[in-house]
Structures are given as structure tokens and as C-alpha cells.
């Protein structure tokens, strides 16, 4: 199986991801914080472009950034199929070069957790601050420390259907609040035989106060911290933490 076809199957598996909720979160926060006239959005860690395309169809001028060339190929094809214009760039989120003056920057689907060094998170916040217009918003989510330390630790998740099945195993790393994801996919080909593909991902998260400190050091004002697509503050057992920060 080529990496291009793996990106295709990844996109299929992510169909159940809460894109409606992420899209609603963006539009709600832009309105809530007086940015109804916002037009330019940078979607960092855009993957196969699902959220970027949805936002573009709502009239936003969207730019997408991702490290994976193959994911971006799917994203570009998706944008063309939906007849929307989106600029896609293959970059590490610590770089973010070649564009500026955004009303809003988003980093969803725990993409920020792929940065394993504190310096990388801080650099990313600093670059985003430079790219935002005055009063522009940064919206992002991360895995909670509870999810990393309790739900993911030594966990195994499985899924099975006729076209694609996977085994997803999680192991702790030496870093605090970090995990290694070992994913094994079995995809059925046209001949009915299954082909195996292995993926390895590492993620790390930090305490909420640490993210707040880094945002403040980068120049941001933290407006709101909530959890799990609600308006409630994070609890000890929250799994996904959302931040809203303003330049």
C-alpha cells in the first residue's frame, strides 16, 4: 500500500472525528469575541483538510499547513472537489513561514501534542503571535494530562470492518505526560487480500498552567479555557482541553 493510499484510508477513518464541533467552536468564538468580520484563517496541522474545506465553504479565506505531503495531497484534492480555493503549505508548525496577517489561527485534533520539546511549543506560539493581526485569535486543543496518564497508558484500541481494521497500542514514554502510539492497519485490496501498514506516533502534553505561561510569554492574553467541547472549565477527568487566546 502506498503512502498516498494510506492517507486516503486515514481520511476515511477520521470521518467520525468531531469536525462539526470544531467548526462550530471556531465560528462561535469568533462571534463571542467580536471577530464576526474575520476572514483569514490559518489551520495548522490541517491533515487531509476536512476542517479547512468546511471553513472555506462558510466563506473564510483559509490557509492550511501540515508536515505530511501525502495528507496535503488529499486535502488539495478535497478542496478541488468541493470547489473551494485553499492554499496549502508543507511545513513544520514551528516554522510557519511565507504568510502573515491572519484573523484567526487554529490547531485542532491534538496536533500541538506532536511537539515533544518544550522549546517547540514555545516557538510555535511565538510564530503564531507574529502571524496574527492585532486582536486576532488563537484557538487550539490538546490532550489533558489525565488522558495521557490514565486513558492512553498501556491501552489497546481496535476497530474491524470489511475494508480496513486496525490495532492501536499505547505505551508510556520517558517524558512526563507522553505516549507512543503504535498503529497497525490491515487494508483489503481489490483482490480481497489484506495488506499491513504500520504507523508510529509520539505525543506529549503539559499542565494547563504551563500552556498559559507559554502563551503569556509569547504575548497572548488567555481569554478562555474549557474542556471537551463544552463551556465548562476543565475538571480532573477532562480529556480534551480548549484554549482561546488573543493577540
From Swiss-Prot:
Pfam family, one: Methyltransf_25
Protein EC: 2.1.1.-
Alphabetic keyword roster: Methyltransferase, S-adenosyl-L-methionine, Transferase
GO biological process, one term: methylation
Keyword Nucleotidyltransferase listed: no
Keyword Methyltransferase in annotation: yes
InterPro entries associated with the record: Methyltransf_25 (IPR041698), SAM-dependent_MTases_sf (IPR029063)
Single GO molecular function: methyltransferase activity
Matches recorded under Gene3D superfamilies: S-adenosyl-L-methionine-dependent methyltransferases (2.20.25.110), Vaccinia Virus protein VP39 (3.40.50.150)
Annotated function: May be a S-adenosyl-L-methionine (SAM)-dependent methyltransferase.
Stated family: Belongs to the methyltransferase superfamily.
Protein name: Putative methyltransferase GWCH70_2453
Annotated organism of origin: Geobacillus sp. (strain WCH70)
Amino acid at each position: 500500500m502506498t503512502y498516498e493510499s494510506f492517507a486516503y484510508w486515514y481520511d476515511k477513518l477520521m470521518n467520525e472525528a468531531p469536525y462539526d464541533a470544531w467548526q462550530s467552536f471556531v465560528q462561535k468564538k469568533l462571534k463571542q469575541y467580536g471577530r464576526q468580520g474575520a476572514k483569514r484563517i490559518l489551520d495548522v496541522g490541517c491533515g487531509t483538510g476536512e476542517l479547512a474545506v468546511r471553513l472555506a465553504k462558510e466563506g473564510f479565506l483559509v490557509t492550511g499547513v501540515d508536515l505530511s505531503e501525502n495528507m496535503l495531497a488529499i486535502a488539495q484534492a478535497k478542496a478541488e472537489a468541493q470547489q473551494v480555493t485553499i492554499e496549502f503549505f508543507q511545513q513544520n508548525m514551528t516554522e510557519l513561514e511565507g504568510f502573515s496577517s491572519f484573523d484567526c489561527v487554529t490547531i485542532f485534533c491534538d496536533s500541538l501534542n506532536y511537539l515533544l520539546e518544550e522549546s517547540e511549543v514555545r516557538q510555535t506560539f511565538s510564530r503564531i503571535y507574529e502571524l496574527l493581526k492585532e486582536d486576532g485569535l488563537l484557538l487550539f486543543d490538546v490532550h489533558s494530562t489525565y488522558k495521557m496518564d490514565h486513558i492512553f497508558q498501556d491501552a489497546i484500541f481496535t476497530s474491524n470492518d470489511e475494508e480496513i481494521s486496525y490495532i492501536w497500542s499505547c505505551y508510556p514514554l520517558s517524558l512526563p505526560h507522553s505516549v507512543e502510539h503504535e498503529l497497525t492497519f490491515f487494508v483489503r485490496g481489490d483482490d480481497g487480500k489484506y495488506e499491513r501498514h504500520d504507523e508510529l506516533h509520539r505525543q506529549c502534553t503539559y499542565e494547563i498552567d504551563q500552556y498559559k505561561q507559554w502563551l503569556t510569554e509569547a504575548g497572548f492574553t488567555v481569554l478562555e479555557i474549557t474542556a471537551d467541547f463544552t463551556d465548562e472549565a476543565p475538571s480532573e477527568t477532562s480529556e480534551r482541553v480548549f484554549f482561546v487566546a488573543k493577540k
